[in-house]
Design a protein with these regions (language model features):
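Extended active-site neighborhood of metal-dependent phosphoesterases/phosphodiesterases
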Residues: 72, 79, 90-106, 167-218
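Core catalytic region of metal-dependent phosphoesterases/phosphodiesterases
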Residues: 133-195
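A structural signal for well-ordered alpha-helical scaffolds and beta->alpha junctions
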Residues: 12, 23, 136, 194, ...
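Short, surface-exposed linear patches
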Residues: 27-28, 40-43, 140-142, 175-178, ...
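Acidic, histidine-bearing metal-coordination/catalytic regions of metal-dependent phosphoesterases
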Residues: 1-126, 146
C-alpha cells in the first residue's frame, strides 16, 4: 500500500484517506478507531471507492541508482472519506485486504482554539539524491523536539521533483511522519510535472492524494 492522510472539507469531523494497491488485490477495507482504543475493540470499518489509475504508467523517470526507466504504475486508487468523527481527538486506522494489513496510521481532528502545525515546502523528493528526503524528515524531527504536540503538517508545494514519477511518491509515503499526521498542502509546479515537462497536469497530485473537491474548477 501507498497511504497518506489528507484533509476533508471540515477536519473537525471528517478526514480523507488515500492509498494505492496492487490490481491483484480484490478487496480492501479501512478500519479506524480512537487512538486510545489499544485493542481495536470499538473500531469501525467501511468500504471505499476505488478506480483504476493509469496516469503514472509509462512516465519517463529515474531510479535511485540513476538508471533511466519508465514507471510501471497501474494500480487501484482507493479513497475513503471518514465522517462523523469527534473534534479534538486522535484517531488511528489501518488498511486491511485479503492478503495483508498495513501499518497503523494516525491523525488528529481539529476543533481546538489553539493548535500548531509543522510547515514545510520545496524538498523535491528525488531518489538519486536521497539526502533531500532525509533532510526534510530531519527538519521535521527538529520541529517535533521543539513542539512534540504539533497537530498536522502544512506543505506549500514542490515536495516531489517530478510529480509524474509515482515511485517518488511511494518512497516519500514510507516515511514515519506520513504515518502520524494529516498532511494538507498545495500543488507546486514540480508536483504537476513529469520529467523534463514532457507532461504537465494536476492529475498527478490529485491521484497521489485525496483532497476535498470544494476548490476551484479543475
Amino acid at each position: 500500500f501507498s497511504i497518506v492522510t489528507c484533509p476533508a472539507e471540515n477536519t473537525s469531523k471528517a478526514m480523507n484517506i488515500s492509498w494505492g494497491a496492487d490490481t491483484t488485490i480484490t478487496e480492501c477495507i479501512i478500519e479506524y478507531t480512537l487512538a486510545r482504543d489499544t485493542q481495536w475493540k470499538e473500531s469501525r470499518t467501511m468500504e471505499e471507492t476505488s478506480h483504476l489509475c493509469t496516469v503514472f504508467d509509462k512516465v519517463y523517470s529515474k531510479k535511485a541508482d540513476g538508471t533511466d526507466f519508465y514507471e510501471d504504475a497501474i494500480f487501484l486508487k482507493y479513497e475513503a472519506a471518514l465522517e462523523e468523527l469527534k473534534p479534538r481527538r486522535e484517531y488511528k486506522y489501518r488498511i486491511v485486504s485479503e492478503r495483508c494489513t498495513s501499518d497503523t496510521y494516525k491523525f488528529r481532528t481539529s476543533g481546538s482554539n489553539r493548535w500548531s502545525a509543522c510547515i514545510i515546502a520545496d524538498f523535491h523528493v528525488y531518489p538519486p539524491l536521497r539526502s533531500r528526503l532525509d533532510n526534510a524528515m530531519a527538519m521535521m524531527d527538529k520541529v517535533q523536539e521543539y513542539d512534540p504536540g504539533f497537530d498536522w503538517v502544512l506543505h506549500l508545494g514542490d515536495i516531489i521533483s517530478w510529480g509524474g514519477s509515482y515511485s517518488f511518491w511511494q518512497e516519500m509515503y514510507e516515511e514515519e511522519h506520513f504515518k502520524n499526521y494529516m498532511w494538507a498542502g498545495v500543488n507546486g509546479n514540480h508536483d504537476n510535472m513529469s520529467r523534463g515537462y514532457i507532461k504537465n497536469t494536476n492529475e498527478y497530485f490529485k491521484e497521489a492524494n485525496f483532497y476535498p473537491r470544494n476548490g476551484y474548477k479543475g
